[in-house]
Amino acid sequence: MRRDDNWFTEVLEEEGMAFSLRVREKLHEERTAFQHIEVYETEAWGRLLVIDGCVMLTSRDNFVYHEMMSHPALFTHPDPRRVAIIGGGDCGMLREVLKHPGIESVVQVDIDAGVTRAAERYFPELTEANDDPRATLLFDDGVAWIQDQPAGSLDVVIVDSTDPVGVAEGLFGPGFLGQVYRVLGDQGLMVQQSESPILHRDTILERLHGHMRGSGFAPVVTLPYPVVSYPSGWWSATLASKGPHPAAFRESDARAKAFATLYYNADIHRAALAAPEFCKGLLTDQ
């Protein structure tokens, strides 16, 4: 919702809080079969993508989210080659994954082509890798797609979803997580956006950890990171592994990476493994 014609405001009624950005104009609005998509030009945060009234990304700070949802997992796997992205319609995750030269194939499965079309038009910097021959973009149900994949056929699965309501709710459940475990190889990992440790520790995060462990994953580790435009300003990615621990990542490769990042590096990777006292035993899997 907007407080007036010059502001976009996301209100979190249950948390008693709101986040606002001053906007210059609305660039795009459409209602697809799945969700309500809006794009704004803001005064200070570049362009703003909103889905169903919730901030999805801004030009100014999306790099933190996309880098922390991709590179920690890819540098934890010993040799990632086959990757699937479930969701990720803005294609920023696809761009980050394809920076890794060893990647042979990435399949991105998002249910709503409208998000990708909006990103191509208004966030071209995020979609610059869409024509990479290693990339396949599908517009389908990610839960159903995972069920159809052969056992052991993927190295890393990244679940870049909206909040766990509506079309994304099934991506947080034990049925889907069990299927992800099945399609991953022996050293496979999945990473899931897991909301705010401040706002959702006792609801979404605790439940997600339980479902992941119940599906066979160990270790399960949550990496927190800042995203100013998201509720509370503090977000997280949860890595669930069939073997490798994020603390034993390929640190020398991360330090010698041949591609540019704006947030992620080997020191950030290691620092993200440190959990505050109120989250120890949950975020650290100890």
Swiss-Prot record:
Subcellular location: Cytoplasm
Catalytic activity reported: S-adenosyl 3-(methylsulfanyl)propylamine + putrescine = S-methyl-5'-thioadenosine + spermidine + H(+)
PROSITE patterns: PABS_1, PABS_2
Matching InterPro entries: PABS (IPR030374), PABS_CS (IPR030373), SAM-dependent_MTases_sf (IPR029063), Spermi_synthase (IPR001045), Spermidine_synt_N (IPR035246), Spermidine_synt_N_sf (IPR037163)
Pathway info: Amine and polyamine biosynthesis; spermidine biosynthesis; spermidine from putrescine: step 1/1
Entry GO CC: cytosol
Annotated binding of spermidine, by residue: H66, D90, D160, S161, T162, D163
Family: Belongs to the spermidine/spermine synthase family.
Protein name, entry field: Polyamine aminopropyltransferase
Classification of source organism: Bacteria, Pseudomonadati, Pseudomonadota, Gammaproteobacteria, Chromatiales
Gene: speE
